[in-house]
Amino acid sequence: MISMASDGTNHRFCESCSKQKRCFSCTLPAMNGRLLSDDRFQCNRCSARRLTPQQTRQLLTELRATLHEMYGFEATHKIVLRLISQKAMEKISNDTRSLGCMKVDINKKTFTQGRKERTEIKWTCTLYLLTDLPDIIAAKVMAHELTHDYLYHHAGRGNDPKVTEGICEAVSGAFLESRKFNGYLEAMKKNPDPVYGAGFRLIFPQLKRYGFKGILERYRSSFTPF
């Protein structure tokens, strides 16, 4: 049996080994590893690269600065990072496969001053991330979710999941490519998912050709401003 890991590498397993528990991080079967408190299994290789909460927060700061350099993403507005269990993630994202989820709450208040009305908008941005993610996977997921944050602020609510997720996957892929993590990029290109995989294959070549601002203009009609 041949299995592809999340880093795009292929691994051959005998029938017995292929039936072992699969690591939630790299998706490969493994005999040796550890069971997390929420029943996720993590192989020894991924466990050795897992980030502590402090390291995860530092990576988020560095990644925001990198995406600001690459595409002009804001790097200063407050984003709360919450490291949570698999069960909590399923409730927040409504997806059993999700490794991360960006939630943006918008509170609008309108004030009347004489004959004029003034509207204030308060944004509350929270990035939910699974605990114990290895460094590269954590960066990949956060780059995706930070793109959601940018789209919320500058485009609005996405009307076409393939376009919205495709843009987020494309930015994540561009970050991975900039760091020479080409195996992860290849895995994204081969992803059979009709939303994430197909969206990436649609948007990534256009991102390289037109740039991020060009992508926003081309797909502006796919979003509804808040």
PLM feature spans:
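Hydrophobic (often cysteine-bearing) scaffold residues that line and stabilize catalytic clefts
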Residues: T56-L59, A138-A139, A143, D160, ...
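Pan-zinc metallopeptidase signature
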Residues: E15-R34, D193-F226
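Second-shell loop/turn segments in exported
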Residues: A48-Q55, Y128-D132, A155-G158
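Cys/His-rich zinc-coordinating modules
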Residues: A65, K91-M102, D132, V171-S172, ...
